Amino acid sequence: MTIANPSPSNFFQQLGRQCLKTLADLRLAIALLLLIAVFSISGTVIEQGESLSFYQQNYPEDPALFGFLSWQVILQLGLNQVYRTWWFLGLLILFGSSLTACTFNRQFPALKAARSWQFYHQPRQFKKLALSFSLPDGDINKIESLLRDRGYKIFQEGDSVYARKGLMGKVGPIIVHGAMLIILGGAIWGALTGFFAQHMIPSGETFQVSNIIEKGPLADSQIPKDWGIKVNRFWINYTENGAIDQFYSDLSVVNNQGEELDRQTISVNHPLRHRGVTFYQTNWGIAGVKVQLNNSPVLQLPMAPLQTANGGQLWGAYIPTKTDFSEGAALLVKDLQGTMIIYDQEGNLTDAVRAGSTVEINGVNITIKELVGSTGLQIKADPGIPFVYLGFGLLMVGVMMSYVSHSQVWLLSVDGDGQREIYLGGRTNRAQVAFEREILAIAEEAEVSSKTEAKVNA
């Protein structure tokens, strides 16, 4: 007696079927979805794409947040850029594979079964239906007509009739799965090909996107190289009590020859979009101050950000009154409204001035021309967003379709004891009470019609 060893092809076929069965397991899909949700929440709670010093300051080793979450753990696990890590993308791919396997293993067979014609040829077959009864002297043609009036599609084979409606209720889950696959694909594509950058640019300057904070491995083609942005002007609107109402940037898209391709004024929540790259207004600052010393040309002096003891923000500049910088004055400003404070070399308050004012310090007339604001821009490109929007649109359509009841009705006409008896039964996958009322109404209407015809014939 010999024992036949399984061939390698059979082994791999069995292994493939087992893997497919595991992937199609609903429990695996739910577990993956929960993991994706947990890590997505962590990416929302933990600031993404910040500098090393930021994480060291906000997530120290001692004491670590929750006893374990320090800056080292965040960087080692990639929690500072969750959505671009290999393990998060791997979870998305695995979840997509599970959805695909479930679609082909469960949803398509269910749709195929729903589309097939299932005729009952024996009265005993109606006993397995939760809703079934018989109509003595019933008219099968009348019942067919009543079903057709209610949107049922009729199929007939001899004395047996099969009717169905709501087939889109079986198509809905397939569309839902397909929509989720499109969303996952868009998220993965965006992570691979998108980038995120930040710039602080003074008014009048032109720049090209270069300060990349995050980018995917395939993002180089998305980063603009043949065009840049010119900041024509930056300004802030203030409320009556001096609080910031909104800040604006007048931006021009220019090519490498300086020609303007597009122009738009942006503000918070109103970005500029050009060739798949979006420029958001997110911050502001004061880049410099233009001054004139006596009759000298107008000079633009840089201003540095300063933190006050109570956490406030100021900007300061040193205005030299001698060519060797041995004497001068300090200028401090809080915002772009124009009020500036000047201190002399000893730190004494000299004057509070506005743009256009002149003050004398160390025998030098200092004329304050204007403050130069700088705009803070966030620059993002995510080619996967259109796919995500498309997926969510299809998802809503699929969910609504899934709520359509798939209802099935069987009829069988049987001759016996000198009279014709109609067996009627049906089932549905949802809205059971409404379905029962519908079938009972059809039965009552058919019965009344049969009695009326019998009286007329008599």
From Swiss-Prot:
In its UniProt record, which GO terms are filed under biological process? cytochrome complex assembly
Identify the Pfam families for this entry. Answer: ResB
Q: Where is the signal peptide?
A: none
Q: What is its main location?
A: membrane
Topology relative to the lipid bilayer, per the entry, is: Multi-pass membrane protein
Q: Could you list which ranges are Cytoplasmic topological domains?
A: 1-25, 106-170
Compartment(s) of residence: Cellular thylakoid membrane
What UniProt keywords apply to this chain's record, in alphabetical order? Cytochrome c-type biogenesis, Membrane, Thylakoid, Transmembrane, Transmembrane helix
Gene Ontology CC: one annotated term: plasma membrane-derived thylakoid membrane
Instruction: Spell out which residues lie on the membrane's Lumenal, thylakoid side.
Output: 47-84, 192-458
Note the SS bond partners: none
Q: Which residues cross the membrane?
A: 26-46, 85-105, 171-191
Changes seen on gene knockout: Bacteria lacking the N-terminus of CcsB are able to grow anaerobically but not aerobically, suggesting its function is essential for aerobic growth. In these bacteria reduced amounts of some holo-c-type cytochromes are observed (cytochrome f and cytochrome c550); unprocessed precursor apocytochrome f accumulates but is not thought to be integrated into the cytochrome b6-f complex. Holo-cytochrome c553 (also known as cytochrome c6) does not accumulate however.
Return the InterPro entries for the record.
Answer: Cyt_c_bgen_Ccs1/CcsB/ResB, ResB-like_domain
Family named by the database record:
Belongs to the Ccs1/CcsB family.
User: What does the record note on quaternary structure?
Assistant: May interact with CcsA.
User: What's its job?
Assistant: Required during biogenesis of c-type cytochromes (cytochrome c6 and cytochrome f) at the step of heme attachment.
What name goes with this protein? Cytochrome c biogenesis protein CcsB
Give the species this sequence originates from.
Answer: Synechocystis sp. (strain ATCC 27184 / PCC 6803 / Kazusa)
